[in-house]
From Swiss-Prot:
It comes from the Bacteria. Keywords: Chaperone, Cytoplasm, Nickel insertion. GO terms for cellular component: cytoplasm. Disulfide bonds: none annotated. Required for maturation of urease via the functional incorporation of the urease nickel metallocenter. It comes from Shewanella halifaxensis (strain HAW-EB4). It holds the Pfam family UreD. It is found in: Cytoplasm. Its main location: cytoplasm. GO terms for molecular function: nickel cation binding. This is Urease accessory protein UreD. HAMAP family: UreD (MF_01384). UreD, UreF and UreG form a complex that acts as a GTP-hydrolysis-dependent molecular chaperone, activating the urease apoprotein by helping to assemble the nickel containing metallocenter of UreC. The UreE protein probably delivers the nickel.
Length: 305
């Protein structure tokens, strides 16, 4: 498997649009995870932190209400300290509108220190016809750090019979542990032809990926059981599958690393609507949290509004 060692999608040079940055640093203080530092530039911001689960810190990221257009640049830098536990989500979808000729850019650098846990659970990205976007997600994990996160992409607006008939979306996702590459993958969608291809989106308008690390065989079995249940629940509305990378994998061809903490499972989803995909990912997330902590998590209330 050919894994690139460096990021190839660089921030574009643009004199149009606005630039927004949000940096958040979490750490333990008085026996709770707290938002210790916050730096922001432009319209990206957060609501107050919430503690529905006791020591874990829930945070809602607020995107610009007007959406993202060509030339706009969004940058998130999230740092979770040793033994800290942070959950981040968004109250709604991020909308990327038709380009004016410039590219829109969104980057997310997520760093988790030793024994920390980050749950990165945003709502979907919606790409309107004519959008021109570059997306980059980098996850940097230290020893014994835990991560569960998802990305959901919607091309066009299928509920309105609006297809992604022109435009392009280029994305990269990297996951590292102790500077070792666990995962590197690329997304390229250029107009409806890519969506129609069997090797791409198989005529589905939505694509989703859910990443979980570390894993072990027992957790893999539980996740696959939930996948089967959700596939039965939603039928043809969604197509779900999973693959394992690392020492927990049953396929030696997929094994890239040699230690248990380097193992990773990726759940893939294709669909036409957000609700079945989101519901399936939430059930898998609940399964993982129950396995890790022995109790079910508190679902962010914003998901129910």
């Amino acid at each position: 498997m050919n894994i690139p060692e460096s990021v190839s999608y660089k921030r574009p040079e643009s004199h149009f649009g606005w630039r927004a940055e949000l940096s958040l640093k979490y750490g333990i203080k008085r026996e709770k995870t707290r938002l210790l530092e916050r730096h922001q530039l432009g319209p990206l911001t957060v609501q107050k932190t919430f503690y529905p689960e006791g020591a874990a810190c829930h945070t809602y990221l607020l995107h610009p209400p007007g959406g993202v257009v060509g030339g706009d640049q969004l940058s998130f830098n999230i740092d979770v300290g040793t033994q800290a536990h942070a959950l981040l989500t968004t109250p709604g979808a991020t909308k990327f509108y038709r380009s004016n000729g410039e590219q829109a850019w969104q980057s997310q650098e997520l760093t988790v220190a030793k024994d920390g846990l980050l749950e990165w659970l945003p709502m979907e990205n919606i790409f309107f016809p004519g959008a021109n976007c570059k997306l980059l997600t980098q996850v940097n994990l230290a020893t014994n750090a835990r991560f569960i996160g998802w990305e959901m992409q919607c091309f066009g607006r299928p509920m309105l019979a609006e297809t992604f008939d022109n435009g392009q979306v280029l994305g990269q996702t990297f996951i590292h542990r102790d500077h070792r590459v666990l995962l590197a993958e690329t997304l390229r969608v250029k107009s409806q032809s890519h969506i129609d291809q069997a090797a791409a989106l198989r005529n589905f308008a939505m694509s989703g990926s859910l990443y979980i690390t570390p894993i072990e065989p027992e957790l893999i079995d539980k996740i696959n059981q939930v996948i089967d249940e959700q596939q039965l629940r939603f039928g043809s509305e969604i197509l779900l599958g999973s693959s394992e990378i690392g020492s927990a994998s049953t396929s030696s061809a997929m094994s890239l690393t040699s230690t248990a903490e380097d193992s990773l499972i990726v759940v893939r989803a294709l669909g036409q609507q957000t609700e079945p995909m989101m519901a399936s990912f939430v059930q898998i997330w609940r399964c993982v949290r129950l396995h890790w902590f022995g109790e079910l998590p508190e679902v962010p209330r914003i998901w129910s509004t």
